[in-house]
Design a protein with these regions (language model features):
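Hydrophobic anchor residue at the start of the ABC signature
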Residues: 1, 9
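Conserved catalytic motifs of ABC-family nucleotide-binding domains
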Residues: 16
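Catalytic Walker B motif of ABC-type/P-loop ATPase nucleotide-binding domains
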Residues: 20-24
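Helical segment within the ABC ATPase nucleotide-binding domain
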Residues: 35-47
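H-loop/switch region of ABC-family ATPase nucleotide-binding domains
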Residues: 56-57
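A short, surface-exposed alpha-helical micro-motif characterized by mixed small hydrophobic
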Residues: 62-64
Length: 100
């Protein structure tokens, strides 16, 4: 399934977009392949200047990939900021990572 996701990404890049909207790009992928997807998405952004708008529930993925994160909870904006700001935001920790 990971190879199919990579093929879909390659097909999307054929049109030379300025932005890609990715809805859970790592969903259903073997955890060992997720890092490869993340690396390729980072390369797409850094080398080709393509903006990535990623909808993702896997916090590890989004923390590795994003420069700016918007967290929603129950359909409302919960927090926004850098990965460091998000992982240290008590509201996000309570909602997504479990209260500490």
């Amino acid at each position: 399934f990971g190879q199919q996701k990579l093929l879909e990404l390659a097909m999307a890049l054929m049109n030379e977009p300025k932005m890609l909207l990715l809805d859970e790009p790592t969903a259903g992928i073997n955890p060992t392949l997720i890092n490869g997807i993340i690396d390729r998405l980072i390369k797409v952004n850094s080398e080709y200047g393509i903006t990535l708008l990623v909808i993702e529930h896997n916090m590890r993925v989004i923390m590795s990939l994003a420069q700016k994160i918007f967290c929603l909870a129950h359909g409302k904006m919960l927090a926004e900021g850098s990965p460091d700001q998000i992982k240290n935001d008590k509201r996000v920790v309570d909602a997504y990572l479990g209260a500490q």
